Amino acid sequence: GSVILKDIFDKCYLGDLKLNSHIIRTGTWETETEDGGFLTPEVFDRYEKIAKSGTGAIISEIFALDHRDRFYPYSTNMNYKGFFKDYKEITDLVHKYNVPILGQLAFFYYNDGLNQKVEPNDISLEGIRRLQAEVIMAAKKLSFAGFDGMQINMGNNFYLARFINPYFNQREESYGGNTEKRVRIGSENIKLIKDNFALNISCRVNPNDVRK
C-alpha cells in the first residue's frame, strides 16, 4: 500500500539509504579552507550541527577536479593532500548521528586536455571517455573517504547540464540527438559506478532552464 507522510521527521528511505527524516541538505559552497586546501574547524563544526539537527541526509559542497574550473575557488579540490583524512573525519562525524552523506561532483567547464573550455559539440569521443574516467576516479575517492553516495551535478547550467540540453548539444552521433543519447554521458557513468562501488548515486538536474 501507499505510505502516507504524517510528519517531515518521519523516517524514510532514499534508495537503500535509511533517513531519519525527509529533510535533505543540498550542496552549497563552503569556501572555508586553509593553505593547501585543508578544511578549517568551522567546516567540521557546521557538518556536525547539520547532522544532529534532524537532517535526513547531507549532500556535500561542490567537489572540483580541475584547478582552472570557474568555481574552483569556491569548491573543495578532490586532489589536495588532506582529502582522505579530512573527509573521513567528516563522514565519521555525520555517521555518529546515523546520517548518510553524498559527495557532489561538478564541472562548470570541462578541460579535455586540448581545450580548457571545450563545448559539448566539440568534445571528441576520447574527451568524453576522459571525463567519464574522471567521474569514476572521483567515485573511488568518495568511497574510500567513507561517503555513502555521490551526486553528479547535471544541473545549474554547468557543463553536464549543457551537454544534455539540445540548445547546446547538436551532436549527430551516439551522444547527441534524442534525450536518451544526450544523457548517455551520465547514464553510462551511473551504471559503471553502481557496478563497481557500493554508493548511492543521484543526479542534480534542472526541470527547466528557461530556454526554448
Q: Regions from the language model: what does each represent?
A:
Residues 1-212:
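Flavin-dependent oxidoreductase catalytic cores
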